[in-house]
Amino acid sequence: KDPREIKDAFLRWRYGITIDDFEAMSDSQGGVCAICGEAPSERHLDVDHDHASGFVRGLLCNDCNRSIGMFGDDPVVIVRAARYLLASAHIQEANQIRSIMAEVLQVHHMLVERMKRIIGDS
């Protein structure tokens, strides 16, 4: 059998879509994962679907498809995870800013002391 026919039969059986539907979704996503935006290097894009209803949501790379599955396909948990990551990024940025400000203050104090010596020597 033709590989395209085999894939079409699988997509119809598993997800209720045709290979033309799959290709239209892929084209609408630019051939990349709907989450990370990366083009799949070794494998094709996976059909992501709601396991309870069977509703096809889009096409994902294998890593993203597995990742949302590990979060139980629960958008609330995924949003919490995103907030957690963003908060830690802000903490890292704040620490970097504090470190830079400490260096700026050191340089400022050195310059003030130099200016005092220069003015005092005049």
How would you name each of these model-derived features?
Residues 1-46, 51-105, 109, 114:
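Contiguous alpha-helical segments
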